[in-house]
From Swiss-Prot:
It is found in: Cytoplasm. GO terms for molecular function: ATP binding; histidine-tRNA ligase activity. This is Histidine--tRNA ligase. Belongs to the class-II aminoacyl-tRNA synthetase family. Keywords: Aminoacyl-tRNA synthetase, ATP-binding, Cytoplasm, Ligase, Nucleotide-binding, Protein biosynthesis. It comes from Mesomycoplasma hyopneumoniae (strain 7448) (Mycoplasma hyopneumoniae). InterPro entries: aa-tRNA-synth_II, aa-tRNA-synth_II/BPL/LPL, Anticodon-bd_dom_sf, His-tRNA-ligase, HisRS-like_core, HisRS/HisZ. The gene is hisS. Homodimer.
Amino acid sequence: MKKKLNLCPKGTYDFFGQSAKIFIDVRKVFFDQAKKFNFSYIETPIFEYANIFLTTNQIADIVSKELYKFFDKSGRELALRPEGTAPIMRSVAQHKLFQTEKKFFYFGPMFRYENPQKGRFRQFYQAGFEIINYKKDSLEFQILEIIVLIKSIFKDLGINEYELKINFLSNLTTRNIYEKNLAQYFEKFSDKLEPISKIRIKKNPLRILDDKIEQEKEFVKLAPKINTFWTMEDKNIFNRITSILEEFKISYKVDYNLVRGLDYYDDFVFEFIDTSQTLGTKLALVGGGCYNNLPTKFGLNNFKSIGMAFGIERLIEIIKSKKNIKEQNLDFFLLSFTDKEILLNFKLAKILRKENFLVDLNKTPFSVSKGFQLAKKSGAKFVFFFEKNQAKNYISLKNLQTGKNEQILYTEINFEYLNSIIKASENA
């Protein structure tokens, strides 16, 4: 079957117009916040050796059915990155970036072969923050920094409808005991489970707990809870975490079924869930937790780490739903009716852009009527143009909202005045 050339692949999209503008604004918020919290930017390849994403537990969803794997011309098995944490740990190990506690930030596209739907794509953007090689006794403070950072980002984005869910998965030993009990419990209900969950019973029963279909079933809601298997140390750690959240007046809800989709998480895990109904269902806007076992895969032992990642497309959808988004229009359009005027306006554009004004100009001469039609379509607030028999060194400036026309000295432009009329037009 012949594929249409004018369609992007299923599960992908093009950013343009309002979405592109919001994307740029959102990206700026993340870079600004990363700088404020002293996170260093790190960029890893879009594709890696596939084995950095593969685990002995092959039931992890992004491994079993969502990983984009391929062989290159030399027979090496590669994969498009489905998430950002494993590549960063690979980079940390490769470049020996582990002498002291490090704080990394990334922003870029990820790839998963999943069913496209609202808030889910096959190519999607994530912004992530990782704190690696921290001291064990500082866990609650690392968590506090991560949560405070998230709330600061939400504030800058104008997002205020969310709920923080938390859980504590304990260490590998305790979790193995819990998973064994969980598997025995779900065996009794195997005939009521979805096909993928029947496989999960033996491979990763934890994933049954947060499956969107399974979690609505009563017997899943009544499944054994992780907290009944906590050691005294686990209870003390969890109490310290919740106490510090309460001290900083951070609202949270304990969800013992919260496990996260990637199987390298342990200890503390969390998600911020959208409660605005913009996305249709209560999807996670950001999620993460501790991953103390993942570093061992890269030869890094006793390596405490915590991180989280935001789904950028979901943030954009929420921001788009708000009615108070202002389009960023041009400040000035420089209209030319002759080749000579085009050259003069290029010089003027350079001067105005240096002063951070938003400027565009026509590069083909137009008649007066067509020229002003073009200027209005550009969305500019004002248009500069030369009139016939105009006084030497002067140019006309027209307010496209009011129609007011005035003469400006071309050789001595008053930037303070231009700023004032731009602000006045924005408040009109």
